[in-house]
Amino acid sequence: MIKIFKPKNKFKDISIIELNKIIANKKRLGLLKIGNEKLGKLIWDFSLPPIESCPDCESCKLDCYAVRYYNQYPDVKKCYDDNYKLCLNDLKTFKQLLIEQINKRNNNKRTKNKIKNIRIHASGDFYNQEYLNTWIEISREFKNINFFAYSKAFSNIPNLPKNLNIINSFVTIDNNNYLNYGTYENISKMRAKIKGIICPVTIGKKIDCSACKYCITKNKVLFVQH
């Protein structure tokens, strides 16, 4: 069950004219973007505004790297904001546009970098059940594509498709929940207890998500504050 969350009106209450402009722009440019330096070139990303779309961000909003990135680059902010407005106001069209983008790229024989791995939310989270269900439907539509995400919005989601890996950002140790993000000292102790790994990118290793691929199928990953 998704945690109760009410999006702000500035994202939900928009005019038909603004919505149609967003749809036209997303249809032209695409909803999925090729990964940044951390994700690498083999992973595509769809993001929403940080904090504004996150049902449970009290434990991480002060140190959220996505907030800095979001506030630093106006084009990124507009992209994430428009994504959120589209999803809140016309989820059906969001799904349709995303499917069209994937099919168009993957069915083009001249295109080299096919969409094979999708990171859901380098920024943002699953803000309600209907939105989560839409991603589940999309992942079932493309069984040959890997989808992965991190979330604080729920404790458990049963019967997820095998190609959709959603990692709970809270780690349970001795019946207590801890955020899987923090100082190197704290994260090292947690890693030993859960027998997981520390994201190599966050400890300075020269590797990206496209090469690592741990989070695509596994869930015991921890992150050093960076």
Language-model-detected regions and their locations in the chain:
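Class I S-adenosyl-L-methionine
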Residues: 1-226
